[in-house]
């Protein structure tokens, strides 16, 4: 079990979150709330598994064992009620590369892709670097909280818009979109 009260100094350990503050923001004393990176120790069992693997001494290419694919299938079934095939599972090293893969797979250069700002900056960068056209549908603050501006979104939609990148929980505003909001979004983009 993790000890969430134990504070670990990560400065000097090649931590992008902590070691890149001065380079990125010009101030090494800021509180780095700019990246989704935890500051808690992993459970001891995880450390032991990594050490056991490292003790083998060879670090060549690895495959995806059936146990991994079965774990993903089980999780999707348990949490979403979805029965998925192993062939549908694609590993990605992180969310940013997955975004880029999806943009490339489902759109063509020049297509328009919508993001809802303020949003995690790699969303916009991934759209631009893939040669797509970025459209911004800014979130609005209503009743003291961020909400989607579906009226504005509907006005932006045309045949050249091929994708909307939805962030939930939304980074950086922290909103988890409700079922009703997601249904309204789905209705808007039909």
Model-inferred region functions:
Residues 2-94, 101:
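N-terminal small-domain helix-loop-helix segment of the aminotransferase-like
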Residues 59-190:
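Conserved core of the PLP fold type I
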């Amino acid at each position: 079990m993790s000890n969430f009260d134990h504070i670990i100094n990560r400065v000097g350990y090649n931590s992008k979150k902590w070691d890149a503050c001065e380079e990125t923001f010009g101030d090494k004393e800021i509180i780095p709330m700019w990246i989704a990176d935890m500051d808690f120790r992993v459970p001891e069992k995880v450390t032991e598994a990594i050490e056991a693997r490292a003790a083998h001494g060879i670090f060549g290419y690895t495959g995806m064992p059936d146990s991994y694919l079965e774990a993903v299938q089980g999780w999707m079934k348990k949490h979403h009620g979805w029965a998925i095939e192993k062939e549908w599972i694609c590993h990605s090293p992180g969310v940013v590369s997955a975004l880029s893969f999806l943009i490339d797979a489902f759109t063509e250069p020049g297509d328009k892709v919508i993001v809802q700002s303020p949003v995690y900056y790699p969303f916009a960068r991934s759209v631009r670097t893939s040669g797509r056209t970025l459209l911004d549908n800014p979130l609005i603050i209503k009743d003291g909280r961020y909400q989607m501006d579906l009226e504005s979104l509907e006005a932006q939609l045309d045949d050249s818009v091929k994708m909307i990148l939805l962030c939930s929980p939304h980074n950086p505003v922290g909103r988890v979109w409700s079922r009703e909001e997601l249904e309204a979004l789905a209705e808007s983009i039909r």
